[in-house]
């Protein structure tokens, strides 16, 4: 698995950020979604972003956020990328990208083969694609649910943008996930937690060690 880049998402404390960065994370994800146990207020997120060392990309995750909400986040928090994790259309992705001049990662939920065309559609507007497990109907959260999808659905496929694999990844299944999908980037949140929203430094270190 040499060279797999890792995003640790849903960090809530400065020590979380330091644990991720010191273990070799390429990205740290900050969640702005009040329904999530990983949600951050702006002042808290600003502190976390400032704690990230140079070379670690700071990503803000939002869900169907308004321009007003995004304006406030971008103004308060030093960021390297925006992650849109709701039902945003390719047109909305393009709007956000143009408005802020930041790279945009668009999440696409996958449950079956019928979801795959969205990956190409969103690739036409986004800079990167996050391929995640589609949440069950009625789920409160669009991601971070600890669910995976059938990795065979994307085995051997290629897209026009860099992409990242997410959904139920853990230190135990990471090697198989990468082998089946060919992912060169992965995203983990609940898989390195001791409780919802509570990151475990030992699990973070173990996951990043497994990704090397």
UniProtKB/Swiss-Prot annotation:
The keyword Isomerase is assigned to this record: yes
Listed GO biological process terms: L-tryptophan biosynthetic process
Gene3D superfamilies: Aldolase class I (3.20.20.70)
Record carries keyword Isomerase: yes
Molecular function GO terms recorded: phosphoribosylanthranilate isomerase activity
Catalytic function, reaction form: N-(5-phospho-beta-D-ribosyl)anthranilate = 1-(2-carboxyphenylamino)-1-deoxy-D-ribulose 5-phosphate
Catalytic class of the enzyme: isomerase
Pathway: Amino-acid biosynthesis; L-tryptophan biosynthesis; L-tryptophan from chorismate: step 3/5
Keywords, comma-separated and alphabetical: Amino-acid biosynthesis, Aromatic amino acid biosynthesis, Isomerase, Tryptophan biosynthesis
Documented EC number(s): 5.3.1.24
Superkingdom classification of source: Bacteria
Family according to the record: Belongs to the TrpF family.
The protein's name: N-(5'-phosphoribosyl)anthranilate isomerase
Organism encoding this protein: Cereibacter sphaeroides (strain ATCC 17023 / DSM 158 / JCM 6121 / CCUG 31486 / LMG 2827 / NBRC 12203 / NCIMB 8253 / ATH 2.4.1.) (Rhodobacter sphaeroides)
Gene: trpF
């Amino acid at each position: 698995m040499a060279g797999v880049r890792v995003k640790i998402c849903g960090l809530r404390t400065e020590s979380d950020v330091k644990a991720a960065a010191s273990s070799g994370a390429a990205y740290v994800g900050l969640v702005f979604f009040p329904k999530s146990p990983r949600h951050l207020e702006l002042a808290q997120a600003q502190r976390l972003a400032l704690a990230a060392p140079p070379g670690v990309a700071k990503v803000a995750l939002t869900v169907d956020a308004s321009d007003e909400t995004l304006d406030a986040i971008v103004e308060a928090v030093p960021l390297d990328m925006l992650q849109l994790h709701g039902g945003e259309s390719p047109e909305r992705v393009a709007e956000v990208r143009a408005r802020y001049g930041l790279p945009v990662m668009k999440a696409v939920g996958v449950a079956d083969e019928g979801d795959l065309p969205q990956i190409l559609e969103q690739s036409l507007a986004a800079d990167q694609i996050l391929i995640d497990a589609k949440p069950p109907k009625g789920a409160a959260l669009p991601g971070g649910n600890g669910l995976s999808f059938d990795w065979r659905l994307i085995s051997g496929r290629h897209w026009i943008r860099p992409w990242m694999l997410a959904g139920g990844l853990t230190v135990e299944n990471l090697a198989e996930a990468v082998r089946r999908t060919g992912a060169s980037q992965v995203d983990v949140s609940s898989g390195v937690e001791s409780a919802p929203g509570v990151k475990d430094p030992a699990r973070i270190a173990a996951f990043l060690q497994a990704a090397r």
